[in-house]
């Protein structure tokens, strides 16, 4: 279920300030953040944001296609190792 349209998109204030500061100076550097819940805005395009996945910061390069999505969508938290079970090939 999505967010109400009357509320608008959400982005943490500290992250938005960092992006605006980099846009003013024209610098490109990696921004570390724990804010997986923040929506990607058009101002973010071209920046690399290191999103925390619970273990480490995953670098995510922001493109135009990502606008409107959440940062957490691009940094998976769990790695699927496969289902546990009998390995029938090794028993033969």
From Swiss-Prot:
Similarity comment: Belongs to the universal ribosomal protein uS19 family.
A GO term from the CC aspect: small ribosomal subunit
Coiled coil: none
Gene: rpsS
Effect on the protein upon substituting residue 15 to I: In strain: 10
Function: Protein S19 forms a complex with S13 that binds strongly to the 16S ribosomal RNA.
InterPro entries, alphabetized: Ribosomal_uS19, Ribosomal_uS19_bac-type, Ribosomal_uS19_CS, Ribosomal_uS19_SF
Any one biological process term the GO annotation gives: ribosomal small subunit assembly
PROSITE patterns noted in UniProt: RIBOSOMAL_S19 (PS00323)
Domain of life: Bacteria
Keywords: Ribonucleoprotein, Ribosomal protein, RNA-binding, rRNA-binding
MF GO annotations: rRNA binding; structural constituent of ribosome
Listed name of the protein: Small ribosomal subunit protein uS19
